[in-house]
Amino acid sequence: MAKDKDVRPIIKLKSTAGTGYTYVTRKNRRNDPDRMVLKKYDPKIRQHVEFREER
């Protein structure tokens, strides 16, 4: 059973390019308490852009 405050929650990373493309990943809440920002590939515009954590 999952706890309410899971140590490794599943998060969605949404493209800042406005295409609506998302990645789904997990993060360690103890090491990264802030919102995650990663530079990943957006296939809709064929470029690497920033993806921000969505809640």
From Swiss-Prot:
Disulfide bonds: none annotated. Coiled coil: none annotated. InterPro entries: Ribosomal_bL33 (IPR001705), Ribosomal_bL33_CS (IPR018264), Ribosomal_bL33_sf (IPR038584), Ribosomal_zn-bd (IPR011332). GO terms for biological process: translation. Keywords: Ribonucleoprotein, Ribosomal protein. GO terms for cellular component: cytosolic large ribosomal subunit. It holds the Pfam family Ribosomal_L33. One of its GO terms (molecular function) is structural constituent of ribosome. NCBIfam families: PRK00595.1, rpmG_bact. Belongs to the bacterial ribosomal protein bL33 family. HAMAP family: Ribosomal_bL33. This is Large ribosomal subunit protein bL33. It comes from Pseudarthrobacter chlorophenolicus (strain ATCC 700700 / DSM 12829 / CIP 107037 / JCM 12360 / KCTC 9906 / NCIMB 13794 / A6) (Arthrobacter chlorophenolicus). The lineage of its organism: Bacteria, Bacillati, Actinomycetota, Actinomycetes, Micrococcales. The gene is rpmG.
